[in-house]
């Protein structure tokens, strides 16, 4: 993939950096795997805003991606690699030997025409999915399950991966890109390799309108609001917070730990690096 630096023909184009999609499929997506995607704009069933800074954006269909990869011992051929507007990673369309087609997260180095397979007997090759107990220690993996049979939840974004560090009994230790080391059951599945589109982090939007196309509305700082709207608001002229930083509801932010799931705390061997 190539990085395209746009010429400064307008203020919005100045500084804009795009990621080339020349290697991706040019036609329409596979229609049977499309579902309607309804814009909620951050509102709940009462119409109240529950997630701020959401609304608008370009319409798109949801691509149904197979995160379980549980069609064991059936080879699948990569028909094409496509752009997915719902995620940073690219997706690959697989055609199984029995005729079924599914989308998967495209790993780095996957080429059209390659053959993939899932199951405990699958070879250690990029794009193949196996239980963690069958993956060699030290391997780079992505699309990792956290619960057996639930489907991949870890390392699904562009350029992400994890490293299998060790196996102890029924659990394996996996180090994520954040530095967190977590215990995962050895019967959970993972895919060999790392996610493609690693240049995504080099993208520069160039103008505010691109954010609006993505369905992201402006974020206003609390210090420029009125006291009725935010704890940081008010004051004569330009002032600071005057207190420890908090969110609009008064909860501490900027470093305050918010993790509240004590049930799975024992699965974290070491916390992520700041």
Swiss-Prot record:
Keywords from the UniProt entry: Ribonucleoprotein, Ribosomal protein, RNA-binding, rRNA-binding
GO molecular function: rRNA binding; structural constituent of ribosome; transferase activity
Database matches in SMART domains: Ribosomal_L2 (SM01383), Ribosomal_L2_C (SM01382)
SUPFAM superfamilies tied to this protein: Nucleic acid-binding proteins, Translation proteins SH3-like domain
Compositionally biased spans, kind Basic and acidic residues: 229-246
Region (Disordered): 224-256
Top-level lineage group: Bacteria
Pfam families, A to Z: Ribosomal_L2, Ribosomal_L2_C
Keyword RNA-binding: yes
GO CC terms in record: large ribosomal subunit
Gene Ontology process terms (BP): cytoplasmic translation
PROSITE patterns (UniProt xref): RIBOSOMAL_L2 (PS00467)
The keyword GTP-binding is assigned to this record: no
Subunit comment: Part of the 50S ribosomal subunit. Forms a bridge to the 30S subunit in the 70S ribosome.
Family: Belongs to the universal ribosomal protein uL2 family.
Function: One of the primary rRNA binding proteins. Required for association of the 30S and 50S subunits to form the 70S ribosome, for tRNA binding and peptide bond formation. It has been suggested to have peptidyltransferase activity; this is somewhat controversial. Makes several contacts with the 16S rRNA in the 70S ribosome.
Stored HAMAP family: Ribosomal_uL2_B
Protein name: Large ribosomal subunit protein uL2
Gene name, Swiss-Prot/TrEMBL: rplB
């Amino acid at each position: 993939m190539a990085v395209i630096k746009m010429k400064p023909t307008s203020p919005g184009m100045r500084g804009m950096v795009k990621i080339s999609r020349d290697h991706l499929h040019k036609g329409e997506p596979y229609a049977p795997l499309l579902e309607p995607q309804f814009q909620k704009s951050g509102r709940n069933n009462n119409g109240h805003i529950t997630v701020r800074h959401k609304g608008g954006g370009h319409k798109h269909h949801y691509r149904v991606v197979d995160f379980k990869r549980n069609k064991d011992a059936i080879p699948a051929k990569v028909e094409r690699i496509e752009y997915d507007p719902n995620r940073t990673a690219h997706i690959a369309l697989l055609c199984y030997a029995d005729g079924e087609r599914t989308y998967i997260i495209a790993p780095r180095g996957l080429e059209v025409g390659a053959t993939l397979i899932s199951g405990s007997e699958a070879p250690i090759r990029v794009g193949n999915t196996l239980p963690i107990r069958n993956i060699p220690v030290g391997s780079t993996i992505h699309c990792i399950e956290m619960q057996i049979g639930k489907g991949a939840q870890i390392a699904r974004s562009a350029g992400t991966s994890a490293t299998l560090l060790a196996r102890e009994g029924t659990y394996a230790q996996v180090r994520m890109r954040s530095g967190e080391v977590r215990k995962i059951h050895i019967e959970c599945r993972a895919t060999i390799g790392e996610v493609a589109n690693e240049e995504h982090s080099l993208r520069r939007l160039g103008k505010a309108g691109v954010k609006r196309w993505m369905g992201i509305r402006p974020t206003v700082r609390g210090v420029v609001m009125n006291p009725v709207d935010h704890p940081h608001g008010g004051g004569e002229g330009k002032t600071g917070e005057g207190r420890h930083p908090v969110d609009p509801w008064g909860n501490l932010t900027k470093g305050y730990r918010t993790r509240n799931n004590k049930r799975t705390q024992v699965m974290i061997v070491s916390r992520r690096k700041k």
